[in-house]
Swiss-Prot record:
This is Phosphatidylethanolamine:ceramide ethanolaminephosphotransferase. It catalyses: an N-acylsphing-4-enine + a 1,2-diacyl-sn-glycero-3-phosphoethanolamine = an N-acylsphing-4-enine 1-phosphoethanolamine + a 1,2-diacyl-sn-glycerol; an N-acylsphinganine + a 1,2-diacyl-sn-glycero-3-phosphoethanolamine = an N-acylsphinganine-1-phosphoethanolamine + a 1,2-diacyl-sn-glycerol. Residues 1-26, 96-147, 209-233, 279-323 are cytoplasmic. InterPro entries: Sphingomyelin_synth-like (IPR045221), Sphingomyelin_synth-like_dom (IPR025749). The gene is SLS2. Belongs to the sphingomyelin synthase family. Keywords: Kinase, Lipid metabolism, Membrane, Sphingolipid metabolism, Transferase, Transmembrane, Transmembrane helix. Residues 48-74, 169-187, 255-257 are extracellular. Predominantly synthesizes ethanolamine-phosphorylceramide (EPC), with minimal sphingomyelin (SM)/inositol phosphorylceramide (IPC) synthase activity. Specificity is likely to be defined by residues in the lumenal catalytic domain that interact with the polar head groups of the phospholipid donors. EPC is synthesized by both stages of the parasite life cycle, bloodstream forms (BSF) and procyclic forms (PCF), by transferring the phosphoethanolamine from a 1,2-diacyl-sn-glycero-3-phosphoethanolamine to an N-acylsphing-4-enine (ceramide) or an N-acylsphinganine (dihydroceramide). Disulfide bonds: none annotated. The lineage of its organism: Eukaryota, Discoba, Euglenozoa, Kinetoplastea, Metakinetoplastina.
Amino acid sequence: MAVPPVEMYSGSFWNRMRKPLPLRTQVIRFTVVFVIVSFILVVALQITHERMPDPKVTKPLPDLGFELLTKVPGMYVLADCCIGFLNILSVFTAFKLYLLHRHCVGSGEPELPCNIPGVSRFFLSVWLCKENCRIELRNIHTIAWIRFITSYALLLLSRSIIMVVTSLPNPDDLCQNPPKIENRVKDILLTVLTAGAGSIHCGDLMYSGHTVILTLHLMFHWIYGAMVHWSFRPVVTVVAIFGYYCIVASRFHYTDDVLVAIYLTIATFIAVGHNADGAPWQLQLFIRWWPCCGANSREVAEDGVPVAIVIKNEEMMNFEGKS
């Protein structure tokens, strides 16, 4: 049996493990991790689809939300519209955060080849933050993306496990006569490429994936959207709550699916946190050993300014001490 080297138990080893990877490397590698997790999720969706109890035998479970809210078939489409709107708003917010980063490092506003009055001003101007300005603006867009994508990957991975463990009867009308998956490979690719919109899977309950992304956008704008414009918080809050209503009213998920997803998403987003070093060092351990997709050391500052490293040997230090 191989004996671990002594240095693994030393402080220097763990100090190296805690040393943060470059932010650009984290962006690339965690995005790749998210794609891999997406494929794992689709495989889990196929398993739950096959294991779902027969709707003709097992009826949906009693649900207080179903009793309080009138059933409105097809409302899940509006939930998809809410997600689409928040996707666009989050991309816009991330771009504005990038402009704040440029302003922080002293770069000027970007310019379009042709100036369009009003449009250029709206998209390319720097909206100086008036809330949460205690957060360092340097690399704010990169850190926000790392926090978003790592939280999302963690939630999807846990969802892949949880929904396979216990199969629940599906309350959704579309799943009362569930379609059969003919080509599994095609279904996997179609589901990943369309973010689930191009296929129908049943039994993927506990917890709601729609609620996860709605809540992630809510948390993203609650922290970072307020730095761009004060109105983003109330607007996104209203849209997210309406999306929750659409999910329950359409019987797309049980109320518990929505409540558990809200809690787990908020807790995960807070646990990942905002840090100038990017993701927590424990998460960086999963991507630190990669031989590709970015550098493993911060030899150059994130804004592209070279870092000067001064090394003094012992003889030089002794000479300076004597002089």
